[in-house]
Amino acid sequence: MPYDYDLRCPCGTGLTYGQCCHRYHAGNHHAPTAEALMRSRFTAFAAGETDYLLDTWDPATRPAELTLDDRLEFYRLEILETEGGGPFDATGRVKFQAFHRGLADGVQEEDSTFRKMDGRWVYSLGDVAE
């Protein structure tokens, strides 16, 4: 389901989707930081952009396919902590909470690692809090 270009982006920046994560999902730009990639991936979960999720996943850990359950709605992202992940770093870490409702209401807390591959950030691994 495509996300509305004029709605506020679910990643939490306060910008519209068209001003924010759409440029990454459309392939016009690459996220400049690990946090920006995390935000764009959260929005991809919210928008059902599975191709983008797979494309920004480290090939060493990426699943062969990805199916999202459209009964689960991701609606809010809170960044708790970042380490590294800047434009000149090779690795980064982003700890966040992803709020969801629908099939199951709740919050998922994850500590994710990222690395630069061929000059662009990719998601490597995530440690989900119990």
UniProtKB/Swiss-Prot annotation:
Signal peptide: none
Domain of life: Bacteria
Coiled coil segments of this chain: none
Alphabetized Pfam families for the sequence: SEC-C (PF02810), YchJ_M-like (PF17775)
Homology family: Belongs to the UPF0225 family.
Protein name: UPF0225 protein CE1570
Organism phylogeny: Bacteria, Bacillati, Actinomycetota, Actinomycetes, Mycobacteriales
